[in-house]
C-alpha cells in the first residue's frame, strides 16, 4: 500500500519578536517536523453478477415458459395430467413425503375405514360441586372402593374405562354427565 509523506511544522509558542537585549544574537527557530501519512483513498470496483434466475435460456424455452405461465389453473392441471400420462410418471414418485402428509391426495385407492369396536371413557373434568355425585356414579359403574373412586377423579383427565363396547361407553358417559362430570369417549 503506497502512502504519501508530508511534513507538518510545529512552532514554539514563544514570542517571535526578539527583545532589544538579544538583538545581536541570532535567535534559533524552535520547530519540530513530523512526517504525516495521508491515506490514499482506494476505490473498489464492484463487479455486477447476474442472479441465477437471469441466466439466458434458449428462445424456445423462454417461449414455452411464457405460455405455461399464462395458463389458467384448470389448463395447468390438464397439462400436468397429460405429461404424467405421456411420460409415465406420477407426482408421488417425486415427493413421497408429500403423499404421506396428504393421504387424501391419493384418490385412486380408496381407504378402507374400519369401524371402531372398542372405546375408552375419559373423565375430563369434575366441578367441585359435583364431586360427591361423581364419586357415587364411579362406584356404581365399577367395583372401586370409596378411596379409589376419589383418587380417580383427582388429577384429571383420566381414563375411566378402557376397551369397552360402544353401548357400555355411552351408558357410562350418560351416568357420569348426569352426576355433573364432563366426559368424552375416545
Curated annotation (Swiss-Prot):
Residues 12-23 have a biased composition (Low complexity). Gene3D superfamilies: 3.30.1390.10, Single helix bin (1.20.5.710). Pfam families: Ribosomal_L12, Ribosomal_L12_N. Residues 1-53 form a transit peptide. Its main location: plastid. It is found in: Plastid, Chloroplast. InterPro entries: Ribosomal_bL12 (IPR000206), Ribosomal_bL12_C (IPR013823), Ribosomal_bL12_C/ClpS-like (IPR014719), Ribosomal_bL12_oligo (IPR008932), Ribosomal_bL12_oligo_N_sf (IPR036235). GO terms for cellular component: chloroplast; ribonucleoprotein complex; ribosome. Residues 1-11 have a biased composition (Polar residues). It comes from the Eukaryota. Transmembrane segments: none annotated. One of its GO terms (biological process) is translation. Residues 162-180 have a biased composition (Basic and acidic residues). Keywords: Chloroplast, Plastid, Ribonucleoprotein, Ribosomal protein, Transit peptide. GO terms for molecular function: mRNA binding; structural constituent of ribosome. Residues 1-23, 162-186 are annotated as: Disordered. Belongs to the bacterial ribosomal protein bL12 family. This is Large ribosomal subunit protein bL12c.
Amino acid at each position: 500500500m503506497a502512502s504519501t509523506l508530508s511534513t507538518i511544522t510545529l512552532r514554539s509558542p514563544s514570542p517571535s519578536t526578539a527583545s532589544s537585549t538579544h538583538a545581536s544574537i541570532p535567535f534559533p527557530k524552535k520547530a519540530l517536523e513530523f512526517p504525516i501519512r495521508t491515506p490514499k483513498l482506494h476505490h473498489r470496483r464492484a463487479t455486477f453478477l447476474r442472479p441465477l434466475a437471469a441466466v439466458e435460456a434458449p428462445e424456445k424455452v423462454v417461449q414455452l415458459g411464457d405460455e405455461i405461465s399464462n395458463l389458467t389453473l384448470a389448463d395447468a392441471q390438464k397439462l400436468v395430467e397429460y405429461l404424467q400420462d405421456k411420460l409415465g410418471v406420477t407426482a408421488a414418485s417425486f415427493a413421497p413425503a408429500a403423499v404421506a402428509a396428504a393421504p387424501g391426495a391419493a384418490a385412486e385407492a380408496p381407504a378402507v375405514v374400519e369401524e371402531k369396536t372398542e372405546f375408552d371413557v375419559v373423565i375430563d373434568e369434575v366441578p367441585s360441586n359435583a364431586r360427591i355425585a361423581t364419586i357415587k356414579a364411579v362406584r356404581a359403574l365399577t367395583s372401586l372402593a370409596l378411596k379409589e373412586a376419589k383418587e380417580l377423579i383427582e388429577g384429571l383427565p383420566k381414563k375411566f374405562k378402557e376397551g369397552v363396547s360402544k353401548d357400555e361407553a355411552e351408558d357410562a358417559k350418560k351416568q357420569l354427565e348426569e352426576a355433573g362430570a364432563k366426559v368424552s369417549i375416545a
